[in-house]
Curated annotation (Swiss-Prot):
This is Dihydroflavonol 4-reductase. Bifunctional enzyme involved in flavonoid metabolism. It holds the Pfam family Epimerase. It comes from the Eukaryota. Its EC number is 1.1.1.219, 1.1.1.234. Keywords: Flavonoid biosynthesis, NADP, Oxidoreductase. Belongs to the NAD(P)-dependent epimerase/dehydratase family. Dihydroflavonol-4-reductase subfamily. It comes from Antirrhinum majus. CDD domains: FR_SDR_e. Pathway: Pigment biosynthesis; anthocyanin biosynthesis. GO terms for molecular function: dihydrokaempferol 4-reductase activity; flavanone 4-reductase activity.
Amino acid sequence: MSPTSLNTSSETAPPSSTTVCVTGAAGFIGSWLVMRLLERGYTVRATVRDPGNMKKVKHLIELPKADTNLTLWKADMTVEGSFDEAIQGCEGVFHLATSMEFDSVDPENEVIKPTIDGMLNIIKSCVQAKTVKKFIFTTSGGTVNVEEHQKPVYDETDSSDMDFINSKKMTGWMYFVSKILAEKAGMEAAKENNIDFISIIPPLVVGPFIMPTFPPSLITALSPITGNEAHYSIIKQCQYVHLDDLCEGHIFLFEYPKAEGRYICSSHDATIYDIAKLITENWPEYHIPDEFEGIDKDIPVVSFSSKKMIGMGFIFKYTLEDMVRGAIDTCREKGMLPYSTKNNKGDEKEPILNSLENNYNIQDKELFPISEEKHINGQENALLSNTQDKELLPTSEEKRVNGLESALLSKIQDKEVLPTSGVKHAKGQENALLPDIANDHTDGRI
């Protein structure tokens, strides 16, 4: 599906004066959401950690209508008041940025507390603006189904088991906790200040993308192709949504007059064997395992119910095949995935992880297999579904387009950030929040 193809699940175009803020705007979800908002005629204020880093914002300023409807603002979730100017005059805020440090030695102070404080700081900016009517928080499936025993179906009334998370401390446990507590704190603060708070809960997000680096969620989704066995347990029993459907869901909920509370945005459920079959049938050039060690072929699916959104009139447009095709096509076009993992005899080539590391611009160690000792019941799917907006995989240096830098300078609104000589980092800003995994934070968001 072409990145410029418009899903029309929400029919009413916004008034030309509608201004919204998107945090974590450079990431996997954030950048696609910005694109769709611009297409709808919104005026978008996109917050990023470093507006002067052309490599990280070029895909935003090159979007259609960016020259008239998009401005970039320097903001840091850890700095109170950092979002004041960007949010001033906005009717809505889409909060996608989050703090993510899986290897943190002090998760309480490096992940959990910054995420909660960041949420409250942004809510304070909304209150100060006096114009914000809706606050949409992109959370994680990890707030719904992280528990010892999986149920067949989950909905918005379900909540992850904090005692289980704290006792097991599985991979990404601090991310789950941070999202759970930030959602609770945000809901309470928004209610106290008469701001409609909407929490949108996505599963594993898959599809084409415009960000310049490899989205972490696709590391998981495409693991049967790459042979990244550490991620097999994540998609053992997984839920999926197309990136475009998710972003249209954000806009739909913003435009829906009475939307408030939690909403699951998930369109498909599948086991790892379903995914393996889909890839084998459509891309026979890839070597896909017939069996996955330790995973029963008859394992049941676990579903996330989107009945609430569908009942409001939202329509999911994409199939599971559309999601995988969009992801594969984009990764191929960007040189991030080979066109085949078989040799002329039909046998498997050199392990693709080595090939990717050496030849396909994927340099970050986090792409490759991690220890399996902490994988519990496949719960990491909820985590990596939203590591949708972490800059894990830097690509090779891109050629700069003539005049691009000057175009950027004219579009950045923080006068302290960009004097004519270039980007002037405010004192202490270098330690700003990691740019939603997928996050804008870890998935490429800044």
